[in-house]
């Protein structure tokens, strides 16, 4: 800890595997995947801190950490996240914590003088509620946000703008990536605030375990959604760190859509639930379509690799081995 390796100062990210990389938020869905990916690629100097070890909302602590560690690269995957209920109940917590984390990390990364590149991870919720489909990068700030999570979205938009401002004023190589709906190991399977895919995995597993006759899912199943395995996002993060240096944020999606009905049938098959799948069409469907336009990163040469079914099999295996076994 605290040492700086002497690697080629002109090397690309992938050629600089001894350069110190700070992954902020390494215990979450995204950060843990990035950490796994860096280690598998042979990066030997990855620095992480738990929240107990480093509270990213405390400016003085963050500045002291950067001054001591002098990382060469930063991936900012740390954020305060939660479901619709949490966002609507604690809006001040969400906007304040996320603004503090972003401001402290980006500013300390510039001031410590050692950081060559920083990547900030946002969310597809930054886009207007009625954005064109597929959603291009330039639809940012073109209309009102989805009210249910606007506090989180506004903070993430501020993060993008902060990276842009630091690039314009200081020449700091800070870039931003906006992933679509993610899933995979380390996902949140909580009954009250999990997203649709882990929620379906949990519900079908519980129905299978209790020999339930049916699983009832809200809506008609017709809305179209896009899902990206978190390992593909980790791969895209490494790709952007190595290939991209620009002002505009970059969308990262799978580019393929699936209806909620198709998704539910696939999860049912993967879990091995033998009962009926029932749709409660009296309940709302939500937005009819949500797809990111990821042509920009794909034109640079990046493509996702994990097919949805393969990713679901792996995610269900992780759920059984880590979430279910932990309850026994």
From Swiss-Prot:
Belongs to the NAD(P)-dependent epimerase/dehydratase family. Fucose synthase subfamily. SUPFAM superfamilies: NAD(P)-binding Rossmann-fold domains. One of its GO terms (molecular function) is isomerase activity. Its EC number is 1.1.1.271. Substrate binds at residues 203, 218, 225, 285. The active site is at 152 (proton donor/acceptor). Catalyzes the two-step NADP-dependent conversion of GDP-4-dehydro-6-deoxy-D-mannose to GDP-fucose, involving an epimerase and a reductase reaction. NADP(+) binds at residues 25-31, 156, 179-182, 195. It catalyses: GDP-beta-L-fucose + NADP(+) = GDP-4-dehydro-alpha-D-rhamnose + NADPH + H(+). InterPro entries: Epimerase_deHydtase, GDP_fucose/colitose_synth, NAD(P)-bd_dom_sf. This is Probable GDP-L-fucose synthase 1. It comes from Oryza sativa subsp. japonica. Keywords: Isomerase, Multifunctional enzyme, NADP, Oxidoreductase. Homodimer. CDD domains: GDP_FS_SDR_e (cd05239).
